[in-house]
Amino acid sequence: MSFLHLSFYSAFTLSSLGLAFHRTHLISALLCLESMMLSLYLALSIWPVQAQTPSFTLVPILMLAFSACEAGTGLAMLVASTRTHGSDHLHNLNLLQC
């Protein structure tokens, strides 16, 4: 395993651990999700170059588009939950209380 692969795996693992352990605020969960998507995007961008397959070059761009949609939806949920509940704490977002 090369240093490049190890750095992508460690970035994805650290961001997923951050998502698992820092679950108090919605903004921290969104930042961890975005770092997971960024590390996945970088790994998918390098993979077709190393494998020398030009047919997979569209996959990172498609994943980046879905990541932008996810970020926009997450920020809209953050604004809506902050307006209705007064904070971005995840324990306030219980569906049984609404």
Curated annotation (Swiss-Prot):
UniProt-listed Enzyme Commission number(s): 7.1.1.2
Recorded GO MF terms: NADH dehydrogenase (ubiquinone) activity
Gene3D superfamilies: 1.10.287.3510
Localization terms from the record: Mitochondrion membrane
Gene Ontology CC annotation, any one: mitochondrial membrane
Class of this enzyme: translocase
Biological process per Gene Ontology, one example term: ATP synthesis coupled electron transport
Transmembrane portions of the chain: 1-21, 26-46, 59-79
InterPro entries on file: NADH_UbQ_OxRdtase_chain4L/K (IPR001133), NUOK/Mnh_C1-like (IPR039428)
UniProt cross-references to Pfam families, sorted A to Z: Oxidored_q2
Catalytic activity, as annotated: a ubiquinone + NADH + 5 H(+)(in) = a ubiquinol + NAD(+) + 4 H(+)(out)
Main localization category: mitochondrion
Disulfide bonds listed in the record: none
Keyword annotations from UniProtKB, A to Z: Electron transport, Membrane, Mitochondrion, NAD, Respiratory chain, Translocase, Transmembrane, Transmembrane helix, Transport, Ubiquinone
Record's keyword annotation contains DNA repair: no
Mode of membrane association: Multi-pass membrane protein
Family, as annotated: Belongs to the complex I subunit 4L family.
Function summary: Core subunit of the mitochondrial membrane respiratory chain NADH dehydrogenase (Complex I) which catalyzes electron transfer from NADH through the respiratory chain, using ubiquinone as an electron acceptor. Part of the enzyme membrane arm which is embedded in the lipid bilayer and involved in proton translocation.
Protein name, per record: NADH-ubiquinone oxidoreductase chain 4L
Organism of this sequence: Struthio camelus
Gene it is expressed from: MT-ND4L
